[in-house]
């Protein structure tokens, strides 16, 4: 059962569902808008070897970041040009990981799905790739997988970037995500790189 605006507010008021910070104006008919945080990760490896821990740079922004498509020609001169002209803190090319401002805590009978806002889709900016599902019992900030496909896009800290859609399960999960053995991302309060190298093969 998908939660409506009334259901979301009731769950927040009862303490079953936690969104911190919570803004009542971000509640949609059956969704909740979440915002872009200030922490990001860019991978530095030549190849993604998924049996090994991936090298990466983690950084914060004060205000804004420019995301350029992978095929975009970008050198130091162009980066400085963009910074000076548009006042962005950082210019990156290719995919990067971001995080939400909000810390979300789901009870064992509510799961969620992340969707990018349609306004971003209309400028060919995708904020998640395959990781839109959030299991019941999860708590933490939501990691975003951000890619620009057409022109460079400027993103701003605290900008509404996506939405969470909540569903109620028929019965509570016996073991929620954060209590499940082998869960990798429970309780995360920051952007985290892939931990797929910890999988048993």
From Swiss-Prot:
Q: Kindly list the GO molecular function terms attached to this UniProt entry.
A: dCTP deaminase (dUMP-forming) activity; dCTP deaminase activity; nucleotide binding
Which reaction does this enzyme catalyse, per its entry?
A: dCTP + 2 H2O = dUMP + NH4(+) + diphosphate
Site, Important for bifunctional activity: residue positions: 132-133
Q: Pathway membership of this protein?
A: Pyrimidine metabolism; dUMP biosynthesis; dUMP from dCTP: step 1/1
Entry's Gene Ontology BP terms = dUMP biosynthetic process; dUTP biosynthetic process
| Residues reported in the UniProt entry to bind dCTP | 117-122, 135, 143-145, 163, 177, 188
EC number(s): the record gives 3.5.4.30
Q: Which InterPro entries match?
A: dCTP_deaminase (IPR011962), dUTPase-like_sf (IPR036157), dUTPase_trimeric (IPR033704)
Top-level division of the source organism's lineage: Archaea
Q: What keywords does the record list, in alphabetical order?
A: Hydrolase, Nucleotide metabolism, Nucleotide-binding
Q: Which residues form the active site?
A: 145 (proton donor/acceptor)
Q: What does this protein do?
A: Bifunctional enzyme that catalyzes both the deamination of dCTP to dUTP and the hydrolysis of dUTP to dUMP without releasing the toxic dUTP intermediate.
Subunit note: Homotrimer.
Homology family: Belongs to the dCTP deaminase family.
Please report the name of this protein according to its UniProt entry. Answer: dCTP deaminase, dUMP-forming
Source organism of this protein record: Methanococcus aeolicus (strain ATCC BAA-1280 / DSM 17508 / OCM 812 / Nankai-3)
Q: Which gene encodes it?
A: dcd
């Amino acid at each position: 059962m998908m939660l409506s605006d009334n259901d979301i507010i009731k769950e927040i008021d009862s303490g079953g569902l936690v969104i911190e910070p919570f803004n009542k104006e971000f509640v949609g008919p059956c969704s909740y808008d979440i915002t872009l945080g200030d922490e990001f990760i860019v991978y530095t490896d030549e190849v993604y070897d998924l049996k090994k821990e991936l090298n990466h740079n983690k950084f914060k922004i004060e205000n804004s970041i420019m995301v350029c498509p992978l095929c975009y020609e970008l050198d130091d001169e162009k980066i400085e040009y963009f910074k000076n002209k548009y006042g962005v803190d950082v210019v990156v090319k290719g995919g990067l990981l971001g995080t939400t401002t909000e810390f979300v805590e789901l009870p064992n009978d509510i799961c969620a799905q992340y969707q990018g806002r349609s306004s971003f889709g209309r400028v060919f900016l995708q904020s998640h790739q395959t990781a839109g599902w959030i299991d019941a019992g999860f708590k933490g900030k939501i990691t975003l997988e951000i890619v620009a496909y057409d022109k460079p896009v400027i993103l701003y800290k605290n900008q509404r970037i996506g939405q969470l859609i909540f569903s109620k399960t028929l019965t509570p999960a016996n073991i929620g995500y954060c209590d499940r053995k082998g869960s990798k991302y429970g309780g995360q309060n920051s952007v985290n790189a892939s931990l797929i190298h910890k999988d048993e093969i």
